Each structure stands twice: as structure tokens, then as C-alpha cells.
UniProtKB/Swiss-Prot annotation:
Listed name of the protein: N-(5'-phosphoribosyl)anthranilate isomerase
A Pfam family this chain is assigned to: PRAI
Signal peptide: none
Molecular function (Gene Ontology), one example: phosphoribosylanthranilate isomerase activity
Gene designation per UniProt: trpF
Source organism (scientific name): Halorhodospira halophila (strain DSM 244 / SL1)
Keywords: Amino-acid biosynthesis, Aromatic amino acid biosynthesis, Isomerase, Tryptophan biosynthesis
UniProt-listed Enzyme Commission number(s): 5.3.1.24
SUPFAM superfamilies: Ribulose-phoshate binding barrel (SSF51366)
Catalytic reaction list: N-(5-phospho-beta-D-ribosyl)anthranilate = 1-(2-carboxyphenylamino)-1-deoxy-D-ribulose 5-phosphate
GO BP annotation list: L-tryptophan biosynthetic process
InterPro entries recorded: Aldolase_TIM, PRAI_dom, RibuloseP-bd_barrel, TrpF_fam
């Protein structure tokens, strides 16, 4: 099975268009003010307009404020929601959209128990985590600690063209999620780095 690729933290329409042209399966928009990759609704609409049919648009939230998700869902017609904070299962399912729950790795929590707590999630994104911090850290973690049999298994955290082929070979995930690993600076995607990343994912699939 081919590993899907999500390019997350897109802040410019031209970066979304380049990612799609090069073969990305999904584009991620960050709705978290603390992130250097955060976008407002005006910016998000321009990015979504650059994404053609059959490429997913994912909205990433970290402990969203009341009404924040509804505004994004209604205004952007997001395909999937991604929750990266301490959101309860009831909140995640409330919006009646497919959702992916981030699983914090390295913070002491049991990932199997974490997955079991979200039985209606469409997928789980395993990312590095430090106690007391919110969201991902852009760092790798021990992939041997990922439990087996996880639906929609997505690996994130410290991925780049230099290591993603090995991660794909070792984990055989449904998808990989990359942000800083394809950037020239925070929030600015680099076309050449995206192309190399996608090529390395394909190489990992073939070996």
C-alpha cells in the first residue's frame, strides 16, 4: 500500500499548489495562535482555493476555543479535523466530521490506552511530546513504542527527506505528516524539499 503524505502548516496558497502538483495527498492548516504556522480565516480561504478536488484539507486545532472549530468547518468545508491537545473524545466527535487524534509520544502516557479512549477517530497521529507543552515539537521519537493494529496510523515528528524512507520501511504507516522538514523557514515551504521528501516516501514504500 502506498503511504499517504500530508504537508502540514501551510501558510501560502503557492505552497499548497506546489505540494499538490508534486503529489501530496493532504494539506494541513494550523488554527493555533501560538504556532508560527497559524493562519486566520482569510489566509485559510486563499489556501483552500488553491487545493483541487480529491486532495484533503485538514484543520489542526490545539484545545480550541468555543466556536473556533465551527467557524473553520463552516467557512472552509474542511475534510478532516486534527486535534493536537487535550481534547476529550466527546469534543472531538461533537463536530460530526472525520477526525484524527494526535497521540503524544515520550510524555509517559500509554499510547495503547490513549488510542482506546477515542474509538470513533478516523486515524491517529503519533508525534513527539514533552510534558507541559502543547502540540508537536518537530522532533523524532522511538518508533518501536507505536502500538500495532492502529487504524489510520500516521507518523509525524522530525521527519525529513533524510529519514522518512527508513521510517516508512520500519513502521509501514498509513500516512506520514511533515511540516518543518520541508521548510526553508517556519511556515515557508520549499518546493525542492517537498519533492525530495515525496521521492523518499516512495522509495521507502518500494523497499
Amino acid at each position: 500500500m502506498r503511504t499517504r503524505v500530508k504537508i502540514c502548516g501551510v501558510t501560502r496558497p503557492e505552497d499548497a499548489a506546489a505540494a499538490v502538483e508534486l503529489g501530496a495527498d493532504a494539506i494541513g492548516l494550523v488554527f493555533c495562535d501560538a504556532s508560527p504556522r497559524a493562519v486566520d480565516m482569510k489566509e485559510a480561504r486563499a489556501i483552500v482555493a488553491a487545493v483541487p478536488a480529491f486532495v484533503s484539507v485538514v484543520g489542526l486545532f490545539v484545545d480550541p476555543k468555543p466556536g473556533q472549530v465551527e467557524v473553520a468547518v463552516e467557512g472552509l468545508h474542511l475534510d478532516t479535523l486534527q486535534f493536537h491537545g487535550n481534547e476529550a473524545p466527546e469534543l472531538c466527535r461533537h463536530y460530526e466530521r472525520r477526525y484524527v487524534k494526535a497521540v503524544p509520544m515520550g510524555g509517559g502516557a500509554d499510547p495503547s490506552e490513549y488510542v482506546a479512549a477515542y474509538p470513533d477517530a478516523s486515524g491517529f497521529l503519533f508525534d513527539s511530546h514533552r510534558v507541559g507543552e502543547r502540540g508537536g515539537r518537530g522532533e523524532s521519537f522511538d518508533h518501536d513504542t507505536i502500538p500495532g493494529g492502529v487504524r489510520g496510523l500516521t507518523v509525524a515528528g522530525g521527519l525529513s527527506a533524510e529519514n522518512v524512507a527508513e521510517v516508512v520501511r520500519k513502521v509501514r504507516p498509513f500516512a506520514v505528516d511533515v511540516s518543518s522538514g520541508v521548510e526553508s523557514e517556519p511556515g515557508i515551504k520549499d518546493r525542492e524539499r517537498i519533492a525530495r521528501f515525496l521521492a523518499e516516501v516512495e522509495r521507502g514504500d518500494e523497499t
